[in-house]
């Protein structure tokens, strides 16, 4: 297993634990479809939260948050739409997109950006 995959799994676990400590509940993890993947789908009160977890060891190519560009946001929105179509239980709930950015350059830092972008 590559260290890249290790970083991804560890980052998703850290993000999930952080969000659960802050009151969110897990609905689904690593949900995938032909349109893309949703790292975490969580519930914050009545709101369905689609969480993109981004981790970076080095900021040479930009930080974790900057890596969620317009193309990536579009894929996340399309995947979220399909998730809601296939999981009608959640379709009438309000939704938002959060990003958890983790940097391991120097001291590990986790930033949770609520409502990081609009659909």
Swiss-Prot record:
UniProt family annotation: Belongs to the UPF0102 family.
Gene3D superfamilies noted in UniProt: 3.40.1350.10
PANTHER family (UniProt xref): UPF0102 PROTEIN YRAN (PTHR34039:SF1)
Protein name: UPF0102 protein Pmen_0910
Pfam family, one: UPF0102
SUPFAM superfamilies in UniProt: Restriction endonuclease-like (SSF52980)
Cross-referenced InterPro entries: Restrct_endonuc-II-like, tRNA_endonuc-like_dom_sf, UPF0102_YraN-like
One Gene Ontology MF term: nucleic acid binding
NCBIfam families: PRK12497.1-3, YraN family protein
Endpoints of the signal sequence: none
């Amino acid at each position: 297993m590559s260290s890249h995959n290790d970083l991804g799994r560890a980052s998703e676990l850290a993000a999930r634990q952080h969000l659960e400590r802050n009151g969110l509940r897990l609905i689904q993890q690593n949900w995938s479809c032909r349109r893309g993947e949703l790292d975490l789908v969580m519930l914050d009160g009545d709101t369905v939260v689609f969480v993109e977890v981004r981790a970076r060891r080095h900021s040479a190519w930009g930080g974790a948050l900057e890596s969620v560009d317009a193309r990536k946001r579009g894929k996340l929105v399309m995947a979220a739409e399909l998730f809601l179509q296939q999981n009608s239980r959640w379709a009438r709930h309000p939704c938002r997109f959060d990003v958890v950015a983790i940097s391991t350059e120097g001291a590990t830092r986790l930033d949770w950006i609520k409502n990081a972008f609009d659909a």
